Amino acid sequence: MSVETYLEENYPAALEDLKAFCRIPSVSTDPAFIDGIHQAAAFVAERLRKAGFASVEMLQTGGHPAVYGEIIADPKLPTFLVYGHYDVQPPDPLEKWQTPPFEPDERDGRLYARGVSDDKGPLLIPILVAEAFMRVEGRLPVNLKVLIEGEEESGSPHFAPTLEKYREKLRCDLVLSADGAMWRPDKPSITVASRGLAALDITVTGAAKDLHSGRHGGSAPNPIAALSALLSSMHGPDGRVSVEGFLDGATPPDPRILTAIDASNFDSAAYYREIGVSAGDPINTGRELLIRQWLEPTLEFNGIWGGYQGKGTKTVIPNTAGAKITCRLVAGQKPDTVIAAITRHLQQRLPKGFQLEIHRHGPGSEADFVDPDLPALKISEEVLGELLGQKPLRVAMGATIPIGSAFRKHLGCAAIFFSFSTADEDYHAPNEFFRLSNFKLGMRAWTMLLRRLAAA
């Protein structure tokens, strides 16, 4: 029996494993889900043991545990480290899910559940492939280490210290990330760059308590009004960030990615139809849209609060209002510099009568890139090209996968993104799904990849 045949025959069991994994509510940002975090870590550890990883352990990180496993086939063989994460985004808003987020639902060739695409489905694939090699051939063609963290969706605040602490254990020739995404379902792609991240909350306070809007209206400071003015000052008419110093250090984009954008023939009108924008297209060309998504920094408002939120009306002037902000960074930008620029901008524009509080979430991460001449990158392209019948595009990712720069800094090695989710699968949104055809494709691809890397 071949490895490929084993995977085909055991696909039903693999699908049940994925469903069981997705039933675990492993939300990393909310302490209410801490039991789910520990259950998910235990699930991954047990699945590694079942796959034949002789050494499996929980690594203490100072936060949620990371799961580590290894199979050393031969010290003379190259060693690869598979990266993924078992934590997921919060499922809110729950009312927009067609089925409960932690009750996996299979329909129309897709599996719907929170975390199924980001990253439980993709990270399970290399584990299943390793198991197939062990069951069929009794060994792997390469040495394989696995590191699955539990804080990626929280910005990986303890990831860099964990790499430093366990540097010798994690030492490898190359990282293969199961996290990431194909750009589009109809075009094979490999991500060669991703944006960095800086996140913060801002809170504006006026009076010491909520006030009656009749008695105090017109004279008391209203934090919602002040907050709204501050937020609106952070972008220009074209939607680009207008915060002074925000762009400090930013470098020009890689011309090879611009070439990929030109070759993509991206349809901006179709994109806006897909996401449900019906009031006209804010950006008229696919080229400009992708440049903004991939190669320009952003400052987005993720949440806003203040005052009465219940049904009906309440005549109140709230004493506080706030917003959640995340910034995506391009090459050359530093999270510390970006946060400092935003802080200065807000403090300079804060109206009299208000106090401003800024809470930063973690250290953030810098943008990342892959050496375009890396041999493993070319091997990955060859594998996808053979399986899908067309050469994959080298694309950038507007999102953030902070592991690339962290692995380069602390382990001295590069990371290749070899994931089989696609960017349209609604991760971070209601009704997240994973194409089961990609679940199968990923198993074939990882099998080929490990063999090709062993022969390189």
Language-model features: locations:
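Flexible glycine/proline-rich, aromatic-decorated loop/lid segments
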Residues: 189-205, 416-420
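Acidic/histidine-rich catalytic neighborhood of metal-dependent amide-processing enzymes
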Residues: 117-193
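Active-site metal-coordination/substrate-binding segment of hydrolases
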Residues: 77-148, 441
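A common structural junction motif
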Residues: 86-87, 234-238, 343-353
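An extended, acidic, His-containing surface patch that forms the Zn2+-binding/catalytic region
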Residues: 184-185, 242-320, 328-341, 349, ...
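A short core secondary-structure module
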Residues: 161, 217-238
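N-terminal helical capping/dimerization or prosegment-like subdomains
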Residues: 1-94, 320, 337
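Acidic, glycine-rich active-site loops and adjacent beta-strand->loop/helix elements
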Residues: 86-88, 147-155, 178-182, 206-208, ...
